[in-house]
Each structure stands twice: as structure tokens, then as C-alpha cells.
């Protein structure tokens, strides 16, 4: 028996660009004071996605939006089950008190990473508001958390994975589902 992987395109490069443009417009519409906005990427692709969104926001508004990184690894309640990976340095460029935080992750699955990221953020202070952006919501919630901004909802089975690929890192762009 072989481990053959099937890859399905969920968002092509063109569709991904349109989705990023839509998400950027939604952020501009929902966040009343963009100068108080802090984009916070969650490793690994959430960091890269935050950079893309920062560029998109700048091209639409002319504002340089601040961005940071939060690594929630040490705040996870499921480390024994999922294991640990190489830790990425947390970098929050400004005090978060009274800031509008936009947590950014590429694919959301059980929501445990998001809960851990929120716990990690609160160790830095109390923001005015925390919002969540995910490129893909797979379902399978274990916690009652919803994204404020979502690129696409893709119900999956547990033997499937979804990957965001970006040109500057992967030499291809899109969102892909892989079945094992």
C-alpha cells in the first residue's frame, strides 16, 4: 500500500489575490482607526500573510500599518499531543494597550493555536480589541472562536491538510488541499 498524496487547488493565484484584496477592504471598513491597528502574525505562514496584508493596506490607504509576531507555542494546552517545533521569536513593536490587534493565521483547524495566541498576547498587556483573520477556516472547532475576517471556509476531513503558498517563499501562490 502506498502513501499517495492528492493535491487539489482551493484558491488559484488569481483567486488568492482577489481574496486578499477583499479581506483588505473588509479590514479598512471594519477598523475605524487604522493608526491603532497592529497586525500580529502567528508562525509560520501567518507571519508571511501579515506582511502581504501590510503591503495591501499600504497600497489602498497610504498608511504604514505596524506588524508583529506572536509565537504561542509555550501557551498551548496540547503540547504533549502535537509536540513542539522550532520557536519563533515574539516581536511586538509597540505597547499593545488600547491597540486594535488583528491576529493573523493562514489555516485554522481546532482553534487551539488561536486560544494560545490570545493568552500570549495578554501577557504583553490588554489591547482594546482582538480580531482574527484566517485565510482558510477548516472547521473542526474545539473552542467557540470565530474569525472576524475569513478568506474561505473549507470543511475538511481529519486526513486532509490545507496549505497557503506565497510566491516570495514557495515560488508558487495559492491555497491547496492535500489528501493522504
Residue ranges and their predicted role:
Residues 1-180:
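PRPP-associated nucleotide enzymes
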Amino acid at each position: 500500500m502506498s502513501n499517495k498524496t492528492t493535491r487539489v487547488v482551493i484558491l488559484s493565484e488569481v483567486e488568492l489575490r482577489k481574496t486578499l484584496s477583499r479581506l483588505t477592504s473588509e479590514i479598512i471598513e471594519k477598523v475605524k482607526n487604522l493608526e491603532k491597528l497592529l497586525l500580529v502574525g502567528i508562525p509560520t505562514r501567518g507571519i508571511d500573510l501579515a506582511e502581504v496584508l501590510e503591503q495591501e493596506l499600504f497600497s489602498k490607504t497610504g498608511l504604514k500599518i505596524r506588524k508583529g509576531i506572536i509565537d504561542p507555542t509555550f501557551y498551548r494546552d496540547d503540547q504533549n499531543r502535537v509536540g513542539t517545533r522550532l520557536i519563533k521569536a515574539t516581536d511586538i513593536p509597540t505597547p499593545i494597550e488600547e491597540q486594535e490587534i488583528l491576529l493573523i493565521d493562514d489555516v485554522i483547524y481546532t482553534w487551539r493555536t488561536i486560544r494560545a495566541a490570545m493568552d500570549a498576547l495578554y501577557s504583553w498587556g490588554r489591547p482594546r480589541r482582538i480580531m482574527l483573520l484566517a485565510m482558510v477556516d477548516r472547521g473542526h472547532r474545539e473552542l467557540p472562536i470565530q474569525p472576524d475576517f475569513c478568506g474561505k471556509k473549507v470543511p475538511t476531513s481529519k486526513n486532509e491538510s490545507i496549505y497557503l503558498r506565497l510566491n516570495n517563499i514557495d515560488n508558487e501562490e495559492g491555497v491547496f488541499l492535500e489528501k493522504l
